[in-house]
């Protein structure tokens, strides 16, 4: 039977105490096929009861539970009869609230630590080795477990690394099972989700699509919706999902600012408009944007100009449409989490629709606001969007304008666009496109002496940036095979005008950012 709302799914909620890893916990649970949400630590008991979760996870956090102002939970949460897992600060909080003792550690643990499972019957460690390495990040520790709890694991500097109360189904781990640095972290979370909470893996993208289509139709009725289409993954998937739900009641405004990658605008129109039938108005505004950028060299100023101009073009087109009641945007769950509030009233500037005039009164519709990025990609493929479009490289809103260092001109954009197309073509030919997080070319504005044919040249340099990463927060430069780099370099110099040198960026993030501007 199809699910019609979120209450039809088994779910495990994560209460947020400020850990840098809190989103990861939610992602890991969803990866198991179980719906999960990250919610405020002070979520009311009434709301928790209404959600009827199969389990609750307390995230880690930077506070000390014994300090004034430390983040707390309503003590009634321990009387709900719902399984609870405390991670790091979450374990300390549960221990403290239930009568245990938490103190500052003599030796803080940050990074890898080896633990020993001391209880062979520990449910969280069922089927796992007695000795394993985990990721610790704490300055406090539990020095006395609450009454009714047993210690199930220890480390050299943390004698109480895990605790359990099997009767009440309360568990705590001092380490971060959600990060990949914990050897069997995912297995520990699985044991909690399936063996302790008895949750069913019934969260599927097919159900989500059906649920969202029903919700969109109910909310929109016979009214009209507009969407600012950037050509990126989020807005493209939003447009396709809305079209599936309401057809031509949706109008997508695609502002082509001339800073897109080679053939990208045409590819978007082919995939979404011609193949999938989405109603799109394409505005060719390349000259308008270039005129505004003339003489501008500061990267932040370029971003602001492009963002402001995008809004103005979008506004002009939106005003031409009659009787529009809804504005759609591709807000993701990460945006909702980062805002810390209900973002239903927030227009996101990075979706290029921020700053709408006060006389344009739209109700906001955000069909992706419960999904993470990789779930959006899965949704896009389910909706029939071409694989290459769904899995395209991350691309900044200002586009190639920030890959041309200094002033942006039509000739410089052409150089970056052509060199980037060559890079992507050779990476794809080498079968490396799925192994590299992001790769692109930049025009740093450096000119150098070269020799081409029998003559001396004084032309531009192209920089190649290719990185590997898991989440984009940190990144290493990709170790591309020399023969692939050689082919890329040769083709760029041969096929791109005014280029006589190619360099490869071998800097990690940090200290560098992935983009050059």
From Swiss-Prot:
E.C. number: 6.3.5.2
Gene3D superfamilies: 3.30.300.10, 3.40.50.880, HUPs
Catalytic activity: XMP + L-glutamine + ATP + H2O = GMP + L-glutamate + AMP + diphosphate + 2 H(+)
Pfam family, one: GATase
Protein origin, superkingdom: Bacteria
Residue span, GMPS ATP-PPase domain: 203-392
Record InterPro entries: Class_I_gatase-like (IPR029062), GATASE (IPR017926), GMP_synth_C (IPR001674), GMP_synth_GATase (IPR004739), GMP_synthase (IPR022955), GMPS_ATP_PPase_dom (IPR025777), NAD/GMP_synthase (IPR022310), Rossmann-like_a/b/a_fold (IPR014729)
Active site: 88, 176, 178
Pathway per the UniProt entry: Purine metabolism; GMP biosynthesis; GMP from XMP (L-Gln route): step 1/1
Residues bound to ATP: 230-236
Gene Ontology CC terms, in alphabetical order: cytosol
Limits of the Glutamine amidotransferase type-1 domain: 11-202
GO MF, one example: GMP synthase activity
Swiss-Prot/TrEMBL keywords: ATP-binding, Glutamine amidotransferase, GMP biosynthesis, Ligase, Nucleotide-binding, Purine biosynthesis
Free-text function comment from the UniProt entry: Catalyzes the synthesis of GMP from XMP.
Subunit composition and interactions: Homodimer.
Descriptive protein name: GMP synthase [glutamine-hydrolyzing]
Gene: guaA
